């Protein structure tokens, strides 16, 4: 991970998220509902639900909305049943893309995803065409200036798998997916507050894009993220947009 301007990418990512905040609640409600349906309504015994509730809290989702989503998932309230789908494909410069969806209409979703790829210079691929390049892991990013040795000691004590210092001075803590929320809570209790973090599918081999290619790739990612059925978009692309 070292060598990339992680800090600049975080600021760009946050600006895009703020612009799309209106869709965040809808996606969180879907995720909470599905997580509760698959693993039950107790976040202590359901890591996927616990992660979804962490995100809901970070985005100030009203507790009533959260509880209704859980109740729909556990069957206490009637609701739409969503299925999870994953699509794989290629973007600008052959950069890999994985698109996770929750939908009640598979035919609509695949048509929308294919259209977004085709219209924006990408290609929808076959199952498994890029998945081999991604690893499922959690990460937490801390701003430059944090004491690396002290953070590393606290992170490893909390159950993190690795700690990486990027060239721009930011520090990244890597966790197993199911350990992410626990490590985050433990570090916050120790006085370390992350500026970014999530459980994600991270590319092991990245594709750096700059200039027009980076702009085109961002447009493709935005088109996919704007689809109602899309929950997450993962890519091997590292965009140099400055």
From Swiss-Prot:
Pfam families: TACO1_YebC_N (PF20772), Transcrip_reg (PF01709)
Gene Ontology terms: biological process: regulation of DNA-templated transcription
Alphabetically ordered keywords of this record: Cytoplasm, DNA-binding, Transcription, Transcription regulation
CC terms in the record's Gene Ontology section: cytosol
SUPFAM superfamilies noted in UniProt: YebC-like (SSF75625)
InterPro entries: Integrase-like_N (IPR017856), TACO1_YebC-like_2nd/3rd_dom (IPR048300), TACO1_YebC_N (IPR049083), Transcrip_reg_TACO1-like (IPR002876), Transcrip_reg_TACO1-like_dom3 (IPR026564), YebC-like (IPR029072)
Highest taxon in the source lineage: Bacteria
GO molecular function, one term: DNA binding
Region forming the signal peptide: none
Cellular compartment(s): Cytoplasm
Cytoplasm among keywords: yes
Family (UniProt): Belongs to the TACO1 family.
HAMAP family assigned to the protein according to its UniProt record, in alphabetical order: Transcrip_reg_TACO1
Protein name, as recorded: Probable transcriptional regulatory protein NGK_1508
Organism: Neisseria gonorrhoeae (strain NCCP11945)
């Amino acid at each position: 991970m070292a060598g990339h301007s992680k800090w600049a990418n975080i600021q760009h990512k946050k600006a895009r998220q703020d612009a799309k905040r209106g869709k965040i609640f809808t996606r969180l409600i879907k995720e909470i509902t599905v997580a509760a349906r698959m693993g039950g309504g107790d976040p202590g015994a359901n890591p996927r639900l616990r992660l979804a509730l962490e995100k809901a809290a970070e985005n100030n989702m009203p507790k009533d909305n959260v509880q209704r989503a859980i109740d729909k998932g556990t069957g206490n309230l009637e609701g739409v049943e969503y299925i999870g789908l994953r699509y794989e494909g290629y973007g600008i410069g052959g950069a890999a893309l994985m698109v996770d969806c929750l939908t009640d209409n598979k035919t609509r979703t695949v048509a929308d995803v294919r259209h977004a790829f085709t219209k924006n210079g990408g290609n929808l691929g076959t199952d498994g065409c890029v998945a081999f390049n991604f690893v499922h892991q959690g990460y937490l990013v801390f701003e430059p200036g944090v004491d690396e040795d002290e953070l590393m000691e606290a992170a490893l004590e909390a159950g993190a798998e690795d700690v990486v210092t990027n060239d721009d001075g930011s520090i990244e803590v890597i966790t197993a997916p199911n350990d992410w929320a626990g490590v985050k809570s433990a570090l916050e209790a120790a006085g370390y507050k992350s500026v970014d973090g999530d459980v994600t599918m991270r590319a092991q081999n990245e594709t750096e894009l700059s200039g027009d290619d980076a702009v085109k790739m961002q447009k493709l990612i935005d088109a996919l993220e704007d689809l109602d059925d899309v929950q997450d978009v993962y890519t091997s692309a590292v965009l140099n947009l400055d």
